[in-house]
Amino acid sequence: DCPWDWSSHEGHCYKVFKLRKTWEDAEKFCTEQARGGHLISLKSTEEVDFMIKLAYPILKANLVWIGLRDFWRDCHMGWRDHANLLYKAWSDEPNCFVAKTTDNQWFRRKCNISQYFVCQSRVPR
């Protein structure tokens, strides 16, 4: 079973934190709250719906950190004229992502901004 103040869904435990932290600090905080804890990973529409039902009553219309980071750096990119992508000028600021507490939209945010967040861990055995 999940800890008493966490919610259970599909083999995972979840908790909304009404604390504002940077992405790094929120991820670290989640690892300290529960064994195997991390920022929430949203892998299905059902999981997003569950997160919204959990987070909206606490945070109202807001944004929460999710466990997705550096997505664009992992994409295969190329120039329209098929030239090799040899010169790169990415900013040093990694891209982190937030989810809305009202629908299934995600947005990029600078990782050093403080946001609310949702932690997730596996149900303890």
From Swiss-Prot:
InterPro entries: C-type_lectin-like (IPR001304), C-type_lectin-like/link_sf (IPR016186), C-type_lectin/snaclec_domain (IPR050111), C-type_lectin_CS (IPR018378), CTDL_fold (IPR016187). Disulfide bonds join 2-13, 30-119, 96-111. SUPFAM superfamilies: C-type lectin-like. Its main location: secreted. Expressed by the venom gland. Residues 9-120 form the C-type lectin domain. The keyword Transmembrane helix does not apply. It is found in: Secreted. One of its GO terms (molecular function) is toxin activity. It comes from the Eukaryota. One of its GO terms (cellular component) is extracellular region. Keywords: Disulfide bond, Glycoprotein, Hemostasis impairing toxin, Secreted, Toxin. SMART domains: CLECT (SM00034). Glycans are attached at residue 112. Shows greater sequence similarity to the beta than alpha subunits compared to other heterodimer snaclecs. Interferes with one step of hemostasis (modulation of platelet aggregation, or coagulation cascade, for example). Belongs to the snaclec family. This is Snaclec B7. It comes from Macrovipera lebetinus.
